């Protein structure tokens, strides 16, 4: 549950001989925090501890849960070049005891950004996962010759109760967590940050040169979502922050899109003297 507490200690936890670290381990970690705060601050220790605690005796149950949400499904996009997601199971080679905790924070899996965006769009869309589309209709000589309807991949990725909880947490990630740069004063934003080392092929994560993938995926406005977006940035070396770097880009995109979309109903913008109030930003009619 969102209020379940985990002692993340000093930000370093031993996981089967390997060290799981939080981004602030050198500053002493976060100590005891609840699940909501774990996600707000992207605590690797908190997430991996919980997943390992509940699924270490049956990791297949964790993998099955991911697959029930269709996050591993090919999207069959309308354009070529689609990446294929890969989430391995405990029956496959190289599934060690460390695999589950590291999978829980995004390592040892391959999920293209468009698949992550599709998943977050489903959260915003009341749990209904739809296939991304780039073409709504084919037109020839002004006539529609073919339409491409919305296709549902998964009618319900989770229960309504779970959906309500995760949407509230994702809103707090932006309003009071590490993703504040993705927020806006004009409307509410929900989403999650991501910061990961990029594997260097055969050298894995231990080569001398370290590249990072920082990301933020979310939707807005939080209360009545209309847009979803993902920003992924590959950069060499530190510093690397999904919230600060990708989140800032997301915030600028969101404000630009929202500003273009704002349209006041002129009929409701007429005062007692029948003077028309000019269109302004949401919540700023008094400045007209």
Name each model-derived stretch:
Residues 1-233:
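Beta-lactam-recognizing serine transpeptidase/beta-lactamase-like catalytic domain environment
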Residues 38, 109, 207, 236, ...:
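Intrinsic structural disorder
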Residues 60, 164, 244-252:
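Short, well-ordered alpha-helical segments
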Residues 144-151, 247-288:
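Short, gly/Ser/Thr-rich active-site loops of penicillin-recognizing serine hydrolases
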Residues 158, 209, 238-249:
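Short alpha-helix boundary/capping segments
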Residues 237-239, 259-260:
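Short beta-strands and strand-coil junctions in structured, solvent-facing domains, enriched
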